[in-house]
Amino acid sequence: MSFVSDSNTAIDQAAISIASPADYLALMKPRVMSLVIFTALTGVLIAPTHVNPIIGFASLLAIAAGAGASGALNMWYDSDIDAIMRRTQKRPIPAGRVARESALAFGMVLALLSVITLGFVANWAAAALLAFTIFFYVVIYTMWLKRSTPQNIVIGGAAGAFPPIVAYLAVAGQVSLPALALFAIIFVWTPPHFWALALVKAGDFERAGIPMLPNVKGPDRTRRDILLYTLLLAPIGMTPYFIGFASPAYGLLSFGLGGVMILHAVRVYLAREGDQANRVAMRMFGFSILYLFLLFAAIVAERILALLPISSATPW
């Protein structure tokens, strides 16, 4: 395995042009940020108390800003390996559009503003958890786990699972079982989702010296672990129905989606070589995104329908 030892001097020297707003938006990882907003919205809607729309909206903005800050700080620290990996070479820092110091300052200021804002508009317990989430993603995952263990995405995946809890805590002032259920779904979903991509991009991770599971333990072990985690994910995806805050319709949907996820995982497990192995892995990667989106979208839809005046049903 190769390890990164070069400095970021060349990257900084290349960032001689004035960065555009689009470059700073790219630093915030907008795709990841949009998923964070969506899962956080779910956390807001499942809260048992009446949510002031202004507080709810401001809390979502603060959480989104915290996610964006995490992305910017991640790109600042990872700019050396981003310059090596094909899938990340066009990011703002390795592409020379944003200097590392600018990305660091942007991320730090945005992180501070997000935490302070959430504290003032919601409560300081939620703000503290948001601060911990940013710290966990940037320091625990990015600076430590990512480059030191093949279990990086297993432990580090907790950072992506915290937003629904932060949002729930912001509007309800406490954390209860429904919020923890959303955390569990995202936490268990993350490893098979990312390992499916890692099977295809193993060469990229190898060049950058990142000890992903396929590079350290081999693709066969990775396929086995993808299947095991998916078998665990399927029933966990149904917990919103089991514990009573989602409807039987959600239960049926999550059961069906879980079955399709298992089918994809079995195909990944059986396809061991060649282009076919890459194709089934990418299909699972793509479907895993749809899986998570549909689960959370179903919960959001049920909650919104329950709030409409034409609905006589109470929230599940």
Curated annotation (Swiss-Prot):
Molecular-function GO term, any one: protoheme IX farnesyltransferase activity
Keyword Cell inner membrane: yes
Gene Ontology cellular component annotations, sorted alphabetically: plasma membrane
Gene Ontology terms describing biological process: heme O biosynthetic process
Localization per Swiss-Prot or TrEMBL: Cell inner membrane
Stretches that traverse the bilayer: 32-52, 53-73, 98-118, 120-140, 153-173, 180-200, 226-246, 251-271, 280-300
Reaction catalysed by this enzyme: heme b + (2E,6E)-farnesyl diphosphate + H2O = Fe(II)-heme o + diphosphate
InterPro entries: Protohaem_IX_farnesylTrfase, UbiA_prenyltransferase, UbiA_prenylTrfase_CS, UbiA_sf
Miscellaneous: Carbon 2 of the heme B porphyrin ring is defined according to the Fischer nomenclature.
Similarity field: Belongs to the UbiA prenyltransferase family. Protoheme IX farnesyltransferase subfamily.
Protein name (Swiss-Prot/TrEMBL): Protoheme IX farnesyltransferase
Organism: Methylocella silvestris (strain DSM 15510 / CIP 108128 / LMG 27833 / NCIMB 13906 / BL2)
Protein's gene: ctaB
